[in-house]
UniProtKB/Swiss-Prot annotation:
PANTHER family, per the entry: PHOTOSYSTEM II CP43 REACTION CENTER PROTEIN
Main location: plastid
Gene: psbB
Cellular component GO terms held in the UniProt record: chloroplast thylakoid membrane; photosystem II
Protein source organism: Sorghum bicolor (Sorghum)
Alphabetical list of Gene3D superfamilies matching this protein: Photosystem II CP47 reaction center protein
Comment on bound cofactor: Binds multiple chlorophylls. PSII binds additional chlorophylls, carotenoids and specific lipids.
Cellular location(s): Plastid, Chloroplast thylakoid membrane
Name recorded for this polypeptide: Photosystem II CP47 reaction center protein
Membrane topology: Multi-pass membrane protein
Pfam families (alphabetical): PSII
The keyword Plastid is annotated on this UniProt entry: yes
Length: 508
């Protein structure tokens, strides 16, 4: 046929059987990728330390999505929470991966069958005998089935009525586990961080989809609307489908980047805004203050801070710190976290407690500045020592650790104090193993960053695709050069210029 590469899909334009075939093959590819990727991730995933080396630090992409839907156990005998399991059942990580691969194979065979047996009676208009599809009816069928699936997910899977529930955690990502969720029917259901909204919205949207599907199955579109929106043209279906997909992609890019109940930080890592707002830092200080109010010592109060909470308060876990084109997991960047060294408290020779000003998200380097509780600069690591007034040496800064591995240890020599001041810029201080993975020390983004970038980018591309195909189908007659008011029958090839009788071709 000699089609250019960007027009090859025209071969299925008026061929419903093979149009179905290529869509089944596409489903096979998607499902096969998901299953294969899951098996690859399971082969390289280390479940031994869910606190300091969780899935998002290791660059896992599909494991978090399985986990948030209720999969927590492996046939390898481990659980995502760090324990061991003896009977993981069929729906383990490997079981889900295998099911996707089996489904992919079945779709592959179905695609071949429909490619070979493309000329089925069901695709033919009984009045004309030519291939045609009743697109409004097909729309109603799909809407009804999607509504049933949506309702079923919300009413059964999420609520635990028939299913495991979903991953639910506290606001600080410490106590996450899979549990049943009751629908939230009040105003709180519209809070993106309330898990109950997931159940209620799926039930409501599913009900609406079922009713809308039944409506479109039982009511035919008016003729003027049918013609005006080109409902008989398959490219209209393509255009509106692309619109649905790019809209969904924009929405999930937002819920992933800004955070929501559907993207728990235990599975995808913290958001950049939690670093920007000092979210975990404030919670840590609140817990320490509560401990001091209970007459605990500073050391005891800091020792009660969960290592998991301290680890969230580290800039290396900020998804906006990794460049878009720095390939690899977070562990390949700053290394595998081994342990929390403790919280450093800096003091000058007059006994004032000093606080290191933290590095903002979009800085690669930042001056080391120590301020007192009133925000007055008291010490720094100067760029030019000849002009310094607040250097660690001049001010006599010391550091003492509370909690963690260095609990109770203090340093007064300036070189060590400056080392820990620099590291305190990056949040809580952790010992990082860079040797095991030959980590290069350059921060990487988490799966939260990759997912957002990918979906925002493709949403933009698909937006243009929607405009393109929508314009093609709405203005098809204009682009083809056919006057819609032309009464005479126009036969392509009769005239050199379509519809212009003065350019009639000579018969051969």
């Amino acid at each position: 046929m000699g089609l250019p590469w960007y027009r090859v899909h025209t071969v299925v334009l008026n061929d419903p059987g093979r149009l179905l075939s290529v869509h089944i093959m596409h489903t096979a590819l998607v499902s096969g990728w998901a299953g294969s990727m899951a098996l690859y991730e399971l082969a390289v995933f280390d479940p031994s330390d869910p606190v300091l080396d969780p899935m998002w630090r290791q660059g896992m992409f599909v494991i978090p999505f399985m986990t948030r839907l209720g999969i927590t156990n492996s046939w390898g005998g481990w659980s995502i929470s760090g324990g061991t399991v003896t009977n993981p059942g069929i729906w383990s990580y490997e079981g889900v991966a295998g099911a996707h691969i089996v489904f992919s194979g079945l779709c592959f065979l179905a695609a071949i069958w429909h490619w070979v047996y493309w000329d089925l009676e069901i695709f033919c208009d009984e009045r004309t005998g030519k291939p045609s599809l009743d697109l409004p009816k097909i729309f109603g069928i799909h809407l009804f089935l999607a509504g049933v699936a949506c309702f079923g997910f919300g009413a059964f899977h999420v609520t635990g009525l028939y299913g495991p529930g979903i991953w639910v955690s506290d606001p600080y990502g410490l106590t996450g586990k899979v549990q049943a969720v009751n629908p939230a029917w009040g105003a709180e259901g519209f809070d993106p961080f309330v898990p109950g909204g997931i159940a209620s919205h799926h039930i409501a949207a599913g009900t609406l989809g079922i009713l809308a599907g039944l409506f479109h199955l039982s009511v035919r579109p008016p003729q003027r609307l049918y013609k005006g929106l080109r409902m008989g043209n398959i490219e209209t279906v393509l255009s509106s489908s692309i619109a649905a997909v790019f809209f969904a992609a924009f929405v999930v890019a937002g819920t992933m980047w800004y955070g929501s109940a559907t993207t728990p930080i235990e599975l995808f890592g913290p958001t950049r805004y939690q670093w920007d707002q000092g979210y975990f830092q404030q919670e840590i200080y609140r817990r320490v203050s509560d401990g001091l109010a209970e007459n605990l010592s500073l050391s005891e109060a800091w020792s009660k801070i969960p290592e998991k909470l301290a680890f969230y308060d580290y800039i290396g876990n900020n998804p906006a710190k990794g460049g878009l084109f720095r390939a690899g997991s977070m562990d390949n960047g700053d290394g595998i976290a081994v342990g929390w060294l403790g919280h450093p408290v800096f003091r000058d020779k007059e006994g004032r407690e000093l606080f290191v000003r933290r590095m903002p998200t979009f800085f690669e380097t930042f001056p080391v500045v120590l301020v007192d509780e009133e925000g007055i600069v008291r010490a720094d690591v100067p760029f030019r020592r000849a002009e310094s007034k607040y250097s660690v040496e001049q001010v006599g800064v010391t550091v003492e650790f509370y909690g963690g591995e260095l609990n109770g240890v203090s340093y007064s020599d300036p070189a060590t104090v400056k080392k820990y001041a620099r590291r305190a810029q990056l949040g809580e201080i952790f010992e990082l193993d860079r040797a095991t993975l030959k980590s290069d020390g350059v921060f990487r983004s988490s799966p939260r960053g990759w997912f957002t970038f990918g979906h925002a980018t493709f949403a933009l591309l698909f937006f243009f695709g929607h405009i393109w195909h929508g314009a093609r189908t709405l203005f098809r007659d204009v682009f083809a050069g056919i006057d819609p008011d032309l009464d005479a029958q126009v036969e392509f090839g009769t005239f050199q210029k379509v519809g212009d009788p003065t350019t009639r071709r000579q018969a051969a």
